[in-house]
């Protein structure tokens, strides 16, 4: 079996930090991510957030495909709230973060941001986009809500 190839738009994830800390993941802006105005198309920030959440869970040992196959459940996005602050442009390196804001029995609310990775002249890493993404755990066959498996909650709460 061939090892999976990384998505060409991603860089290696920064090692995760646990127990409410923030996971950081780097992504480069490619031509396909931009619109006719030369800035990142607004919906692509949701893709960047999704990839960061997936890499964060993977860093915690939570592989979503394996869970679907072996446990029969999966996370689905149930709501998004996004605010855009500044545009990103072609070839920018972005630092995308994920942090648990709230954990319920069947859902998690994740606080996410995208910032320019390279600081500006004043040393700031400008905030480009921020959002709260709610994901729910569902039975993969019926798509009905279920409690998040304890092993996942344990991974989220384990000390670093």
For each feature predicted by the language model, list its residue ranges:
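Catalytic strand-loop segment that frames the active site of acyl-thioester-processing enzymes
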Residues: 2-62
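HotDog/MaoC-like acyl-thioester-processing domains
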Residues: 2-17, 21-25, 84-93, 101-160
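A broad, structural micro-motif
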Residues: 40, 75-77, 128
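Residue-level recognition of specific faces of alpha-helices
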Residues: 45-48, 76, 134
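Small beta-barrel nucleic-acid-binding modules, principally OB-folds
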Residues: 71-87
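Short, solvent-exposed helix-to-loop capping segments enriched in aromatics
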Residues: 57, 66-75
């Amino acid at each position: 079996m061939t090892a999976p190839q990384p998505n060409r738009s991603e860089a290696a994830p920064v090692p995760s930090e646990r127990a409410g800390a923030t996971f950081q993941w780097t992504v480069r802006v490619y031509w396909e991510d931009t619109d006719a105005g030369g800035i990142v198309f607004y919906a692509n920030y949701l893709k960047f957030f999704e990839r960061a959440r997936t890499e964060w869970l993977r860093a915690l040992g939570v592989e979503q495909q394996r869970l679907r196959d072996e446990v029969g459940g999966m996370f689905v996005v149930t709501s998004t709230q996004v605010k855009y602050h500044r545009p990103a442009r072609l070839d920018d390196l972005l630092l995308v973060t994920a942090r648990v804001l709230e954990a319920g029995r069947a859902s998690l609310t994740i606080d996410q941001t995208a910032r320019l990775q390279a600081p500006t002249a004043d040393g700031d890493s400008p905030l480009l986009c921020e959002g709260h993404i709610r994901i729910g755990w569902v039975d993969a066959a019926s798509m009905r809500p279920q409690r998040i498996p304890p092993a996942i909650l344990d991974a989220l709460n384990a000390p670093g």
